[in-house]
Amino acid sequence: MTTIKRYGKLVRSTKHLTDETIIYQGPGVIQNDKGKWYCQQCGTPHQDEYYTYHSKIHDQPITYCRSCLSLGRMDSFKPIYITKTAHQISLGEYHLDFELSEQQAYASSHIIRAIQQQENLLLYALTGAGKTEMMFAGIQHARQQGMNVAIVSPRVDVVIEISKRIIESFKGENIDVLYQGQSQTYQGHFVIATVHQLYRFKQHFDVIYIDEVDAFPLAMDPLLMQTLIQASASAYSHIYMTATPSSRLLKQFKKENIITLPARYHRKPLPVPKFHYFKFKPKRMQRYLLELLRKQLENQRVTLVFFNQIEAMEQALAHYQKYFKDLVAVHSEDALRFEKVEALRAGKHPIIFTTTILERGFTMAHLDVIVIDSQSFQTAALVQIAGRTGRKLQDTSGLVLFLHNGVTLSMVQAKRQIKQMNQLGLQKGWLDAEM
C-alpha cells in the first residue's frame, strides 16, 4: 500500500504526517503589522471577507475567513500546518498511438523550452488542436528532472476528461486526480485537479499547465490566479492553454511567449457556423426544430442542442421528449450529469439538450451542434461550442448551426475567428483542405 505524503501542503493536523518537514505552524488567519487580516488558505486581501466574533467557549475574539469556507474553515484560533515541498525523479514515460503533427511538435518544443527557462507560455490553440498530447513531452522532461507537475482546469468535467486520457498514456506514473469528492492517493508529484484544489498546496509545483484558462470561474476571479502563484515553487513555469483568450489575457504575455496553433491535428479545417433565423418558443413544439432533429437522427448524427437558460431548456424538453424517447437534458445543477454524459458517449442519447456545461472538454465522433437563441451567447462560448464538431480523425466535419432571433456581433465575431484560424492554418501549411 502506498503511503500518502503531504509535501508542500496546508494541513489541519499532524496526525497523518510521517517524514514531512513543517515550515509553518500557527493560526489559519493572521494579522499583519498594518492590522490587515490574511488567510493562509486562499490569501484573499478583501477585508470584508473576514468576520470577527466573540467566542464564549474560548472567551476571546476569533476572526475567520468567509472566502474559502467551502474548503474548510480558517480562523485566528485553530492552528494549521504547512509542510515543505519535496521532489522525486521519475521516468515520465508515456505512450501515444500516433505521431505528433508538425504543429503539435512545434508547440511541444516551445513548452519544453519554457519549462527549462522557467517562463510562462500561452498556447492559443484552436479547439481540437490536440493540446493534451502537446503537454506530454513537457511533462516527461519535468518529471525526469524531479519537478512537481500540476494540470489544472476550472471545471470538474474537463478535469475528469483530461485525467482519463493522461492516466491511460502515463501508466507508469502515480497521478493524483483531485476535485470535490476525490482525495489524494499518492505523493502529489504529479497532480490533475480543479483550480480550487490548489488552495491546499503551498510553494510546491515547478510546472503548472492551466487548461481552459478563460473558462468560468478562473477568468472572472483574480483570487484564483493568485492561488496559482501561491501553489508554485519560487521558480516556476505556467503553461496557459485556451482556444478563446481575452484581450486582457493576451496583454499579459510577451509576443514571443504566445504560440498560436490554428490547425487541428488531423489537418482538416474547423467547421464554419451557419446562421438560420428561428424564433424559439420554449413552451410549445415547433415544427422546424422537430424536423431538424428528425433529420439528424436519419443521418445517424449525435446532436448537442445548446440552450442559454435551464428553465427554457426544461420547458422545451417536455415537448420534444414526446417525439424522441431517449432525449434527456443536462446542466451544471444536474446531480446525474456525469452519468448522462457517459450514457451519451455510449450511444444511448443521440440527441441531448444541454447548457454550456458541454461547451468544453467533451469530444466524440459523428457529432453536430445546434445553438438555440445563439444571439444570447458570448463569442467565446460560440467558438467553444463550434469546436465540439469534427474533432475525430474518422469524422473531421460536422454541422454547426446557430439558430437566432437576430444576428449579433458575438455571432459574427465567432464565425470570423473560426474562418481566420482556418486561413492561418492554410498559410502555415498545417491544413490540407481548401476553405
Question: What do these predicted regions represent?
Answer:
Residues 203-277, 284-291:
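Post-DEXD/H (motif II) to motif III coupling segment of the RecA-like Helicase ATP-binding lobe
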Residues 233-248, 388-417:
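Conserved segment of the helicase C-terminal RecA-like domain
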